[in-house]
Amino acid sequence: MAANRFTRGIAFSLSTLSFCVAALCTSTQAGAQPAAVTIGVTLSSTGPGASLGIPEKQAIGMLAPTLGGLPVRYIVLDDATDPTTATKNARRLATEDKVDAIIGSSTTPACLAVAAVAADTRTPQLGLCPFVPSAAQMRYVFSLPQSVAVMADAVLDDMKAHKVKTLGFIGFSDSYGEAWLKDIQARAGARQIQVAPVERYARNDQSVTAQALKMMSANVDAVIIAASGTPGALPMSTLRERGYKGRIYQTHGVANNDFLRVAGKSAEGVILPVGNILVAEQLSPSHPGKAVATDFAKRYEAQYGAGSRNLFAGYAYDAYLVLDRAVAVAAKQAQPGTQSFRDALVSAIEQTRGLAATHGMINVNAQDHSAYGEDGRVLVTVKGGKWTID
């Protein structure tokens, strides 16, 4: 299915990436042109979130020149992992470029910043990181990655199975770390797991020795690190260096090869929940998302090298799959570039059911704007420097 969804031939201009193939912009009916869809994208291509934003940008660069049968133009901006810049980018995309939807951003703080603009301008947002918008923002905001709740259940169930009773927490001192802490604390009690001590660090910190020593002093059975990208390697490597022997868990925010490269041998044995794309070939042949995940992984690696697949490129492609289906529906009701079209797009996305994507099956409804349930996750362990399903 996805074999014809990729193309090269994207023109780069400064920080803006856009394309529109001329043959597709010319209508088959003389004197008429089909209305083009414009999609804004703000990603963390630089800064601490670059290991997430770069592959997302690469995936956008592989997309077909149509969306829902209409020509499409993508405008891609870099927010440098800065929520303030993400806000400016989103505002520009919505008010100046008048995009039909916004994809992004790459990190939770930046996604939340974009959500505020999306709600204010009534522009659909497809976030590429797990986050929970406010009730007032929910109408126009969707989140592609697996929710913290879905992933937290997977790691907590594994902890219970391995008789973990005490759990230390080291997480980002931002909305991503806070989301994981709240969810872990809310769910751990039912599994008779005590969460303490709780430590934080910033994405650009160079040392977490003090936090690691507190874990060692408490002699906890396991530690979970709530971080994303390569900064997630720091607490883990510090714990290993200090001789910590307990189980170490990470979140799906670190699931890329840059993390493995930075973490080195300290990543061996770490446990984390990931999406299907990372281990597509290891999935059961009957898994409903295996075909799409395997196909995209092969095409991505053909372009960017063996082993380069990652969750984040998959999220960007999943955004395309969702929009491709939704645009085809919305275009029957309104013209791109209008508020009526954007509203129709939201309604169409809310009707997404059983869409096979790189992480599993996407199901969305008006009450739940997250994409994946339990079938969109799998627990893996790093063995021999590779992601392995136990």
Model-derived segments and spans:
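Extracytosolic ligand-binding ectodomains
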Residues: 2-9, 21, 31-390
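Bacterial N-terminal signal peptides
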Residues: 11-26
